[in-house]
Every structure is written in C-alpha cells, then in structure tokens.
Curated annotation (Swiss-Prot):
Essential component of the COP9 signalosome complex (CSN), a complex involved in various cellular and developmental processes. The CSN complex is an essential regulator of the ubiquitin (Ubl) conjugation pathway by mediating the deneddylation of the cullin subunits of E3 ligase complexes, leading to modify the Ubl ligase activity. The keyword Nucleus applies. This is COP9 signalosome complex subunit 1. The PCI domain is necessary and sufficient for the interactions with other CSN subunits of the complex. InterPro entries: CSN1_C, PCI_dom, Rpn7/CSN1, Rpn7_N, WH_DNA-bd_sf. Residues 218-388 form the PCI domain. Residues 1-10 have a biased composition (Basic and acidic residues). Component of the CSN complex. The holocomplex is comprised of 8 subunits csn1-8. In the complex, it probably interacts directly with csn2 and csn5. GO terms for cellular component: COP9 signalosome; cytoplasm. It comes from Dictyostelium discoideum.
Amino acid sequence: MEDMQVEKNTEGSSSSSSNNNNNNSISNEFDLETYINNYSGFTKIHRLIFIADNCKQLEVEAYNMALKEVQKTPNLELYNTIINKSHGILELDPVYIENLSKKNSLQLDKLEQDLNTAKSNMVKDSIRFAQNDLGEFYYKIGDHQNALKCFIRTRDYCTTSKHVLAMCFNIIKLGVDTQNYTHAPSYIAKAEQSPDLDNVSNAKLRSVNGLYNLDGSRYKLAARKFIETPFEQSNVFSDIISPQDIAYYGGLCALATFDRNELKKKVIDDPMFKNYLELVPELRELINDFYNTKYGSCLKYLDKMKPILLLDIHLYKHVEILYQRIRSKALVQYFSPYQSVDMNIMASAFNTTVTLLEKEISKLIMENEIQARIDSHNKRLYARKADQRTTTFEKTVQVGSDFQNSSNSLLLRLEMLNNNISTVSNRKDNERGNWENPHHHHQMQHQMFGLFNNNNKF
C-alpha cells in the first residue's frame, strides 16, 4: 500500500502563511477574544499565532492566548514554536516540557501496543480503531506525516460507508490544518459519494471544498461552494471555519467574479446566504452598495474591513487580488451606461485622483475590459463606437451565405429524390472513417451537382 506524503511544517500552518511583517494596524474596536472564540482546536491556535506574527498591537495578547490553548494539547512542538516566536514575551517551562514528554512517550507506547495486539487478533474493527487512535495521537502532537499514514491505513479495515467517511474527514482535517490541499479533491469526492452523508458532513465538505478552491485562486468555484454551505450546520465545525468566514470568503469571491444577475440571484436574494450576511452587516451593505452602483460607499467599506481580512490565515494572500478585481468591475460597470464621462467626477466617486484613475482606465482599455478612449487634455472618457456600417455589412454577407448553402443543400436533396438516388454507407468504411473523407465527400458532391445542373427543371 502506498503511503501518502504531507509537507513537513514544524510551526503549523501559521508559519507558512505569515505575511512576514508585524506592521498591520487594526481598529481598537476589534475584540480578539470575541473573534477567536469562533474557533476551536488547532485552527484556533494557528490563527492566534498568525495574528501575533502580523499585528504588533495584538502580539502580546495573541501569544498569551495561543500558549494557553496549546497547553490544553500534547503538542510540544507547537508549544516550543510559540515560545520561540514570542521573542521573550513568553518563558519556556522546562518542568512542563519534561512532564509532557514522558506522558507522550507512555501514551505512544500504549497505542502502538494496542495496534500490535489488534493485528495479532486479526479483527478488522479492532485494527481500524487502533490505527485511528494512533493517527489521532500523532495529529495532536503535530506529527502530521505519521498521522496521515495511520489514517490512510485505516482504509483497508473499513467495513461500512461510515468508516470510509470518517477516514476521509480525518485526511481532509490534516490538509486544512497544514494548508496542504494535495489530497483534498479525491477525498472530498469520495466522501460526497457516501450514502451516509448527513447534513453536517455535507456542510463541512462544501466549506472545505471552498477553502481548497480559494487556496488555488479559483475564486468563482470557491464562491459557489461557500454560498452552497447550509447555514443551519455552519456553527458545528469551528475546528475548520466559522460562519463569519463563510460570509467573507463567499461574499468577496462572488463580488470579484459574479456578474450582476448572479450576484443578485445567488448572493443578495439567496435565502440561505442572507443568513451568513446578517452575521457581517458591513459586508451585506458593501455588496448591496456595489449592486446599486454606490461605488464610493462600497470602496469605503472595503477599506475599513481590509485590516481584519489581512489577519485571516486563509484569506490574507488573496485580499489584494480580490480587491483589485472588485475595483476593476466597479470601474467597468460605472462607465458602461455612458457615451462619455468626466474623469474628475469619476475620480471623486472612486476616492482617487484623476492621474491614478487615468492609469487604471488605461490598463482596463489595454486588457479590453473597457471599449473606450481617453481624452487626457480635457480629462474625459469616451465610449469607443463600433463601425455600425461595417458590422451590418458583414452580418448581411453572412446571412446571405448561410441562406445560399441551405438552399443548395435542399435543392440537391430534392434532385436526388427525383432521380431515385440514395447513399448507402458501408459499415466497415464507416468504422474506418471513410464516410468522413473530405476527398470522397467533395467528389460525391461534385457528381450530384453535375446531375442537378443537367436535369434542373426548376
């Protein structure tokens, strides 16, 4: 059996996801304790470390909270990471380390002995339980490589679809914690096929699928998966994601990729996603302002929530891309109803200068997103009109050509019927593809049109 690999990450997912700076400033109204209580398990710890690494204002508070949480687990590796990262804020406790090391060693010996006993008894369920317990222990101490091996090995001892579903979720959980989604698609698909998939499991899979697509910058797919996540079950898997996260991820990805009709139908008017938006009123107002072409207000909301989004362990690296796409869409939609626009007024609407706006518009024109030309002297933007005369002529020629081809085909068929001519295909020729031979088809057509021209009575 092939063992699957997981990337080694000695500092948890938080280290690989860091912005590598500590300069993000955030409003004093932000309550870290309220925010972090939306999460549980290692997700909570990794988020605290990420926030401490990237926000000087919250550094001390976040490291202290992370230390308190990690001491509820047997993960010494993560404990050491937090101490080292704190740069003297926290002190190492040698007694705690020694005691926990002994405890972990005894627990590992016991679990390995249980597995060996189960294997010697050759009882499938016992082996699966033992492998799963060992994998769970490795997961808790931060040994993700061995945890993955154990979870994969339970596959050979699964006797029901529920067992398979549990195995899939264990592997998916590892992927989310390490932010390594290599195995996510196959195990999400396998889990979705389970006849025992309940509503909670289905919601969990949708949200994880959303994270997988977000990580791969497939923003439209990510938006769809988050929007499809049932609201009633969204607060029961806080070890992965919070309902507020689903609102932010789904809403921003939708703004960046959905057209107006999709935004109205699948986000604004969707009864299920409305519940998520109620949890984040500013996001709800932002989306409504965008749809109602109140771009100045929309952009102000985006600027206000940006510091919080940059402290999100999954979203931070996509914020600039999503913001740029949303802004570009707003510029295109603002200009689309007009033949010309005063760029001074447009710059005011988008909280920018005419010089910067001109650069943005130039880029959109180069990318063929806006059909327009810029009058730099008068600071006006003019819609580029298509040559209606040429377009009409080309359409007329195409319609005439289509009509001629259709008429010739009809007349040919009528003449063949009048002369009792039919085509019989040879099965072997068909299998070889001779019926598609262009030379054969052209020769036959030439003969038929010759017959048509000689006997034409029309």
